Amino acid sequence: MHDANIRVAIAGAGGRMGRQLIQAALGLEGVQLGAALEREGSSLLGSDAGELAGAGKTGVTVQSSLDAVKDDFDVFIDFTRPEGTLNHLAFCRQHGKGMVIGTTGFDDAGKQAIGEAAKDIAIVFAANFSVGVNVMLKLLEKAAKVMGDYTDIEIIEAHHRHKVDAPSGTALAMGEAIAHALDKDLKDCAVYSREGHTGERVPGTIGFATVRAGDIVGEHTAMFADIGERLEITHKASSRMTFANGAVRSALWLKGKDKGLFDMKDVLNLNYL
């Protein structure tokens, strides 16, 4: 990586998240927008990335080929789809580029591929790049250790109508944080759907409920419910810029790191809490 500014490339530059990532990259000191990518055949190819994001002319044109821009960036930021992200991962591993991965919906094989690539390159992989969400995950660990064995735990999440995976990656991360605090495996205690005559709630399970509606950016609540009282820990996002700023901050944090798999707890130094 260069000694001066960290140069970032943005995948899916024409999407809602891509445009905000461009804005965030242009707004953070120490970061330089080096490249912007869109799929082959996109009408946005050749556009100025800054103008596309409403941030003014930058001289960085939207490209479809990573090969064409491989010398223009140090860290690749990807919030696209699992299949595309894994293709980008292979390229970055081959060429020694760091990655910030905010894509959700990976299966176990995809997560394993990311872990393998981190033996050769530095990767920040997180379900959510919001500072508030990651503080919430730490709070959930604390609450679960105190209340988890005595309460019914439910996770409710809501997103816009265009989101294609459920539960959200953040909801799953919440479940993982709670399960880990209780020395459980989420796969063994998660309940993802209830329909018909389900019988009574099984003690020790973690329930998930999903809402998809309108333009909700992202809302997540963890509920610890007992007889006579209920604790709820909630995070609500009103703008995707909170995720974009966290992702670009993560790219800057990767400066000087050659390899390893990290998450936002590392970036924010939350592990000491």
UniProtKB/Swiss-Prot annotation:
It comes from the Bacteria. Its main location: cytoplasm. The keyword NADP applies. GO terms for cellular component: cytosol. GO terms for biological process: diaminopimelate biosynthetic process; lysine biosynthetic process via diaminopimelate. It is an enzyme of class 1 (oxidoreductase). PROSITE patterns: DAPB. CDD domains: DHDPR_N. It is found in: Cytoplasm. (S)-2,3,4,5-tetrahydrodipicolinate binds at residues 160, 169-170. Keywords: Amino-acid biosynthesis, Cytoplasm, Diaminopimelate biosynthesis, Lysine biosynthesis, NAD, NADP, Oxidoreductase. NAD(+) binds at residues 12-17, 38, 102-104, 126-129. Pathway: Amino-acid biosynthesis; L-lysine biosynthesis via DAP pathway; (S)-tetrahydrodipicolinate from L-aspartate: step 4/4. It catalyses: (S)-2,3,4,5-tetrahydrodipicolinate + NAD(+) + H2O = (2S,4S)-4-hydroxy-2,3,4,5-tetrahydrodipicolinate + NADH + H(+); (S)-2,3,4,5-tetrahydrodipicolinate + NADP(+) + H2O = (2S,4S)-4-hydroxy-2,3,4,5-tetrahydrodipicolinate + NADPH + H(+). Signal peptide: none annotated. The active site is at 159 (proton donor/acceptor), 163 (proton donor). Its EC number is 1.17.1.8. GO terms for molecular function: 4-hydroxy-tetrahydrodipicolinate reductase; NAD binding; NADP binding; oxidoreductase activity, acting on CH or CH2 groups, NAD or NADP as acceptor. NADP(+) binds at residue 39. The keyword Hydrolase does not apply. Belongs to the DapB family. Homotetramer. Catalyzes the conversion of 4-hydroxy-tetrahydrodipicolinate (HTPA) to tetrahydrodipicolinate. This is 4-hydroxy-tetrahydrodipicolinate reductase. The gene is dapB.
